[in-house]
Amino acid sequence: MPLEEAPPALAPAAAVREFRVAGDLGIGLVVAEPQISQPLSISFDDRGRMWVLQYRQFPNPNGLKPVQVDNWLRTKYDRLPDPPPKGPKGNDRISIYEDTDGNGRADTVKDFLSDLNLASGMALGYDG
């Protein structure tokens, strides 16, 4: 279907109502924009906290200017970035969401690590 014929995006709560799950399973909205942006990786620790890698600057890294994009969306930039920690600060982050009142919604968020540039994965250790 052409993009101009696509239906408008649903609000988060409306989108959850459209899901169909099997048997006695359930689904609920834990967190939505603007509290979260472009989640790429989600993990839960032993305390039930949700750790989220937010890929907020995809597809272009901070500090670089796109100069050419081909038919396959491969991008050439004005320069090669310096490797961390010398390169530009990014906008990606790892955040920790927690439901402290037991209602199924994340009511606290803490940025664990920020200023990442094109972060693409994370792994949790013991106790987060």
Language-model regions, residue ranges each:
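Beta-propeller domains with acidic blade repeats across secreted/periplasmic ectodomains
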Residues: 1-128
